[in-house]
Design a protein with these regions (language model features):
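C-terminal alpha-helical cap/extension of soluble enzyme domains
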Residues: 164, 172-239
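Active-site mouth loops of central-metabolism enzymes
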Residues: 2-18, 69-80, 125-136, 238-240
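Catalytic beta/alpha-barrel core
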Residues: 10, 31-41, 94-106, 123-132, ...
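Glycine/small-residue-rich loop that forms an oxyanion/phosphate-binding "nest" at active or ligand-binding sites
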Residues: 63-106
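Active-site-adjacent beta->alpha loops and helix N-cap segments on the catalytic face
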Residues: 39-54, 101-117, 133-136, 160-175
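N-terminal ligand-binding/catalytic initiation module
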Residues: 205, 231-260
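Structural preference for beta-strand elements that scaffold enzyme active sites
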Residues: 2-6, 30-33, 60-64, 95-98, ...
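Short, acidic/polar
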Residues: 12-25, 78-89, 134-144, 194
């Protein structure tokens, strides 16, 4: 399985968004995620305008629309009505729309149907910035998102210890046999960075990389992530070997920066 690389753009206005898109495009991602919650005054006209211009810039690169709410680590809180409105509008020009299904269960079915009707696929997402839920909770969350109609199910968690990362990677590897849709999983922060690389263990179909800026703690720079993922084509690495490889690579880059 080839892991796709997705790079976020987080401009605070149209000009910043489009400028970041041009820069990120040079990093050759498979997908580009527009984090629309960074724009303060967002409405359907703004979304239609920016998504159309983004598609013109990025060409064949897949576009993911995300409005990350404050409840799940984003910049803004909005009503269910507005959330549904902007997600459905974005679906007209985007390939994927991120939906925080667990936080919008009352509207999830209709929202997902509307997004698909407008031509986009749905990434059901759930984020835990304070902890790593139990294995049972993680599996239950992912199954519920699939049941609601997600085409891809994504979960991000925060570890408190190395054991949390190892446990999360283990349950992630089980999810590929439990769900019937692709998964995206990540353990965040410095501790969890290895999970973004060990995708042959986690079965994560996409890894998010830092472009102009990082959109979540622990994101690896796009060029480093690509090199590390490429190595796995030639070596079958276990968890400890992959972690050691990542640490050595970062140490080498740190030494190079000190010499420059």
């Amino acid at each position: 399985m080839k892991t796709k690389i997705c790079i976020p753009i987080m401009g605070q206005d149209e000009k910043e968004v489009l400028n970041q898109a041009e820069k990120v495009l040079q990093m050759q991602p498979d997908l580009i995620e527009w984090r629309a919650d960074y724009i303060e005054k967002l409405d359907t006209d703004v979304i239609e305008n920016i998504t159309a211009k983004l598609k013109n810039i990025i060409g064949n690169v897949k576009l993911v629309f995300t409005f990350r709410t404050a409840d799940e680590g984003g910049k803004q809180s909005i009503s269910d009505e507005k959330y549904s409105e902007i997600c459905c509008k974005a679906a007209e020009n985007c390939d994927y729309v991120d939906v925080e299904i667990m936080g919008h269960m009352k509207i999830a079915k209709n929202l997902i149907a509307g997004i698909k009707k407008n031509g986009a696929k749905v990434i059901g997402s759930n984020h835990h910035f304070d902890n790593t839920p139990s294995n049972g909770e993680i599996i239950d969350i992912m199954k519920k998102m699939e049941e609601q109609g997600a085409d891809i199910c994504k979960i991000a968690v925060m570890p408190e210890a190395k054991e949390d990362v190892e446990r999360f990677m283990d349950v992630s590897s089980q999810l590929k046999d439990i769900l019937n849709v692709p998964i995206i999983t990540m353990s965040m922060g410095e501790l969890g960075a290895v999970s973004r690389i060990c995708t042959n263990i986690t079965a994560s179909s996409v890894s998010f990389a830092a472009g102009v800026d990082a959109s979540a703690p622990g994101q690896v720079k796009a060029d480093i992530l690509r090199k590390l993922l490429k190595v796995k084509k030639y070596f079958l690495l276990n968890y400890n070997q992959e972690r050691q490889l990542y640490q050595r690579h970062c140490q080498k880059l740190h030494l190079l920066r000190k010499l420059m």
